[in-house]
Amino acid sequence: MTASSPSLSPTLELACELIRRPSVTPVDADCQALMMRRLEAAGFALEPMRIEEVDNFWARRGGDGPVLCFAGHTDVVPTGPVQAWQHQPFDALIDEQGMLCGRGAADMKGSLASMIVAVERFVADHPGHKGAIAFLITSDEEGPAHHGTKAVVERLAARGERLDWCIVGEPSSTSLVGDVVKNGRRGSLGARLTIRGVQGHVAYPHLAKNPIHLAAPALAELAAEHWDDGNAFFPPTSFQISNLNSGTGATNVIPGELSALFNFRFSTESTVEGLQKRVEAILDKHGLDWHVEWALSGLPFLTEPGELLDAVAASIKAVTGRETRPSTSGGTSDGRFIATMGTQVVELGPVNATIHQVNERVLASDLELLTEIYYQTLVRLLA
């Protein structure tokens, strides 16, 4: 079954149209143009925002009152080896098992289609709805994420735009659609550490300073450190060394320098400044000649039980019969940028079992359920 099949539902028809556009990050491949045409027909005011090489748009419908925003990305990761796919990655096929196959099916063109169709139905049923509905869409989520949601949020905040609630369409579900929603994410703090020694001949170690030997006890202490206990919403902060590099490639040369890359995934129990000071204190304790460059990817955020989480949970229960489980596990998402506006943020999307993999796929019927969950959430908040 393909995108041209007359038996496809509106959600699946749109999902297939989006998947068939090869929008490998940061290319949008006119996915946003397709979405904007649909939203304009539903009464939305459109504001394209091309920033550097990245396509973004902001769309809004409604007046004063609370604003519910749907956020997501049209870009996808590269396919990997095309010959390893059972079907061409941008053909958007529904197979014999009822799976919608294609790059972006789960992450996250299926969610985008469900959002659009749910909103179209809602504004048709409730043309005089309360508050406003908005869309914040980017083509720079899978890449550096410098000129996408982060940049749009900065512009919206600068002009005082209101954003009360936001549903991000990231694939949050693990086994069944709606079984897990993300109501927060840990912060991500990375660093490049350089330890300086003195290069020399291995036969004359007294004339050199081996940075590997010098750094090893400090790195071991950092790896063993207990950073915090976490809390009811977040696991304890984790520290991981991801890269170590030193040496000339020769067995008879003591290197002059060691570089290490490491990352914190940190909870709301720790701060950026606190983690940095503790790392630097350990390095000083070991008497190292060190330099560190820090890179903050995002602060932790948390949406506690309230209007948005309650509405989403009630909608999932009504549509699927199951209780959802809020979670803050996993990596970062664009929700971290939106949360800086004081917005309640929840990530809700399809099952994430095959995201970024060869043969990415999602159960087609799950997108119908997701559309209904989005629709019922709109009803609970804005009808």
UniProtKB/Swiss-Prot annotation:
The record's PROSITE patterns line, in alphabetical order, gives:
ARGE_DAPE_CPG2_2 (PS00759)
- Where does the chain bind Zn(2+) 2? 107, 142, 356
| The reaction(s) this protein catalyses | N-succinyl-(2S,6S)-2,6-diaminopimelate + H2O = (2S,6S)-2,6-diaminopimelate + succinate
Provide the E.C. number(s) assigned to this enzyme.
3.5.1.18
UniProt-listed GO biological process terms: diaminopimelate biosynthetic process; L-arginine biosynthetic process; lysine biosynthetic process via diaminopimelate
- Cite the cofactor comment: Binds 2 Zn(2+) or Co(2+) ions per subunit.
Write out the residues that bind Zn(2+) 1: 73, 107, 170
Q: Which UniProt keywords apply?
A: Amino-acid biosynthesis, Cobalt, Diaminopimelate biosynthesis, Hydrolase, Lysine biosynthesis, Metal-binding, Zinc
Q: Which InterPro entries match?
A: ArgE/DapE_CS, Bact_exopeptidase_dim_dom, DapE_proteobac, Peptidase_M20, Peptidase_M20_dimer, Peptidase_M20A
Q: Catalytic residues? A: 75, 141 (proton acceptor)
Q: Give cofactor(s), names only.
A: Zn(2+); Co(2+)
- Pathway(s) where this gene product acts: Amino-acid biosynthesis; L-lysine biosynthesis via DAP pathway; LL-2,6-diaminopimelate from (S)-tetrahydrodipicolinate (succinylase route): step 3/3
Q: A GO molecular-function term, please? A: succinyl-diaminopimelate desuccinylase activity
The subunit field of the Swiss-Prot or TrEMBL record says: Homodimer.
Q: Which family does it belong to?
A: Belongs to the peptidase M20A family. DapE subfamily.
Q: What does this protein do?
A: Catalyzes the hydrolysis of N-succinyl-L,L-diaminopimelic acid (SDAP), forming succinate and LL-2,6-diaminopimelate (DAP), an intermediate involved in the bacterial biosynthesis of lysine and meso-diaminopimelic acid, an essential component of bacterial cell walls.
This chain belongs to which protein, by name?
Answer: Succinyl-diaminopimelate desuccinylase
- Organism of origin is Pseudomonas paraeruginosa (strain DSM 24068 / PA7) (Pseudomonas aeruginosa (strain PA7))
Q: Which gene encodes it?
A: dapE
